[in-house]
């Protein structure tokens, strides 16, 4: 958090002092096809596909499902960056996200709804973090006001696209 604050302040200082066109972005959780399975949504999707293909027992291993995060399709994030390049104000910091935090449990439920097989869920203690912020949610009013940008891809569509990516990759 401290490094992010310092980075933002440096951007503002350089923008003013050297008349540089600098726009700072605080991007929240990106999700989308081809994302590494080191990230929760892609991990759950990959596990689901492995189970569907009988390459894994029908159990998804999870960590904390109560945490709420602001997930946004990476394709919407790219559109946000493009909008900021065209209409963002130099020296300003913009939050880029969906503006809506949803629980990891809700994400998992959406993934399991799209699965072709019955899957159980088990907690793996090694996936639990010693400290987890309960809710992280972006206030996107500034980027919307300044550029007109809002995310347009529905979470269920993103999940479908991620599942399709893993279904193709794990042939």
Where are these regions (language model features)?
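Active-site Tyr-X1-5-Lys
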Residues: 1-23, 45-52
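Amphipathic terminal alpha-helices
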Residues: 155-171
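Non-catalytic, hydrophobic alpha-helical segments
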Residues: 77, 81, 96, 107, ...
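C-terminal "lid/loop" region of Rossmann-like NAD(P)-dependent oxidoreductases
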Residues: 59-60, 64, 91-94, 102-109, ...
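Glycine/proline-rich active-site loop of Rossmann-fold NAD(P)-dependent oxidoreductases
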Residues: 5, 30-46, 53-58, 74-75, ...
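Rossmann-like NAD(H)/NADP(H) cofactor-binding core
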Residues: 21-26, 94
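PAPS/PAP-binding and catalytic site of the sulfotransferase fold
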Residues: 40, 44, 103-115, 158-162
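Residue-level signal for the nucleotide or nucleotide-sugar donor/cofactor binding architecture
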Residues: 2, 35, 39, 69-75, ...
